[in-house]
Amino acid sequence: MACKSKDIFSISEKKSKIHFITQITELIIKSSNLMKTLGFETSKIEGIVTIEEENPKLFFEENFDFFNTNFNDLEKDEIKIFIENEDNQLSLGTIFFAKPMNRYLHFIEDRNFFDIIENSSLTAHFQPIIDMQTNKIFAYEALTRGVLANGELMYPDVLFAKSARNDMN
């Protein structure tokens, strides 16, 4: 299977419009009301609630708990986010690149994982496999670890779980 991780997901830090997109009317109303609760003016067109934000990445970092508290997992998967700025205009063609809200929240939650990917800080350890009958090495297995900024290791179970949930496998 081909690797899908050529394009590393990131959240813009430029002044942008953040579009919350869904075909479920109740989620449009809920999204609009919750953005107003946060103090944002919203604009709505059918299926899209829009706010303007100076730094979308900081917006998701600051409101991480708010989104997790006020939206359940099904809602976070249903609501798609599109960040529009001068580099990325919303159109009929680009709207298909909108990602689920969960993807943005995972990006914030899994910051250590993305640091490992961005910095290419993976290490491999080779471990011998011993034949119990002959007590000789008959093969080796490679164990991949991510190296965190503080030097600690992210073990394969965590590394691969974060890779899968961020669609990087």
Residue ranges of predicted features:
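N-terminal accessory interaction module
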Residues: C3-N102
